[in-house]
Amino acid sequence: MDSYAPTQALNEAKTNADPDRFWAVGFPLLAVLIFLMSTHQGIGILPDSARYMNMAATPWDAPVYAAMLQLVALTGIDIVAGAWGIGLVLSGLNAFLTWHILRVASGRATYAAMGTALVVIAPQTVALYGLAMSEPPFLTAILATLLAFLRYVQSGDRRWLIAVGVGIGVASLVRFTGPALGAAMALFLIIDPRHDAKRRVADVARILIPSAVIFLGWAAIAAEVSGRSTGRPLEWLGNMTAREWWLSFNALAAWIVSDELPAVMRRILFLMAMSASLFILVRHGRSVLGRAANGNAEASLIAIPLGFFFFTYLGFMVLATAIETNLHLNGRYAYPIYCTSIMAVTIAMAQVNIADPVIRWLHRALIGLACLMLVSHGIRSTVRVHQAWQEGVGFASLDWARSPTLAAVDRLPRDAVIYSNGSDAIGYVLRRPARDIPAPFMLRTGRDDPNFPYRVQLAGAQAALARGNTYVVFLNRIDWRFYMASEQELIRLLRLVPVAKLEDGTIYKGSIKEERQQ
């Protein structure tokens, strides 16, 4: 019997390794397949995408994704093709990292597979990975930071905390919400029972110093070189009302099931799921911290900073909405904590002791909810992928490619000056520069631009129109830029006359009388 034991152990290890390999390869392949189908008409382009690609009049803010695109473009590769390539790589990489972290931290392949599936096939994931946006690289930075933190928890090697700090600094330059991850990590280090108070403070410093040097160093250099860094004044300019907060809550409730279900049902399911998840996370946290105090450090400790991240991120977003005008906590901004919350609950559920009847009942309820979410996610994501396959997304959609107004703009002289409410659409579809039409106030502040006041914008546009070979283009599909002057207002103030009126827009120029007077 003793001679057989090593062989039996090897066979069991091989049996356990086989499903691990399957999921480690299967999830990245699934993510890549979804990406390829979603970008059948080209990677989706939204207004922020055009900013990252320098195809819009408004510059980008956080620099990392824009730098990635520009570095690819320097090789001679088309920048849009570069964005597609980056998206392809990150879709597979992030799926693998999610699986790997969950597998190591949970210790159970079935739970890790369930958690990874809830991330990979989520409609938010499908939508955002099919776009040239900063969310995929932001999640890569988060996952890489979590992986470094996991190595620290397992080994106790404090050099990994330096890597964590670097990861947080980089994440903060991908999206400015990155510091919330650092706050979550710091909270865990402060309560880590394995070390005394002096060591805990020193460990917090190990992640704080490199992350602060990276972020603040960039901000100082950017302000010196370009005169701007985060692109936001540090003032209390937020204007979210109770209605906007309610809409933000509804965006979070859509994590669970489709918007097509009654709103009351979605809200109740979300609150029940959050309450049950928090209960299990707290129970798991108390248990695993107790074992850590006795010198038994487990990988599942990482569920604690993941749980903290939900609150630090929401706190950061509340602060951001208080500072910036017209900023709402929509599905895009909430996406990172969807992923990390799923990971936290997955790890806790895999490790929590279900001997307690209450925990056992909640555990079963959450498993049932996860199955419901998988079905809902699968249906919604299939619909999204099918629509993206047929029509494309954003400015890369067939509607924009077939726009009669853009076709007419493309026939204008190549040296013509163009003002438009859709300078980004013109920049992407036609690959020619365009300026924004005058705006009475700025989107982020609700105030007139102190560096380029509305009256100066109007005077500049009027002078350009008077010189001739200047056109103002209004695209009817762009109806969300309420901070820009209306079409009727500019017709009156700039004395515009129509050159071409088409089904999806109008092209204007200055009046001949005005030009002759100049």
Model-derived features with residue positions:
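Extracytoplasmic catalytic/substrate-binding loops of multi-pass membrane glycan-assembly enzymes
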Residues: 40-52, 58-71, 77-81, 225-230, ...
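Transmembrane-helix motifs of polytopic, lipid-linked glycan transferases
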Residues: 85-106, 140, 144-148
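Membrane-lumen/periplasm interface segments of specific transmembrane helices
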Residues: 34, 41, 202-283, 306-317, ...
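Membrane-embedded, lumen/periplasm-facing catalytic core of multi-pass transferases
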Residues: 49-56, 149, 366-427, 450-466, ...
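Signature aromatic-anchored transmembrane alpha helix within multi-pass, membrane-resident enzymes
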Residues: 28, 110, 208-212, 299, ...
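Short acidic/glycine- and proline-prone juxtamembrane loop motifs at membrane-interface regions
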Residues: 130-137
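Perimembrane helix-loop-helix junctions
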Residues: 4-6, 151-155, 181-212, 285-292
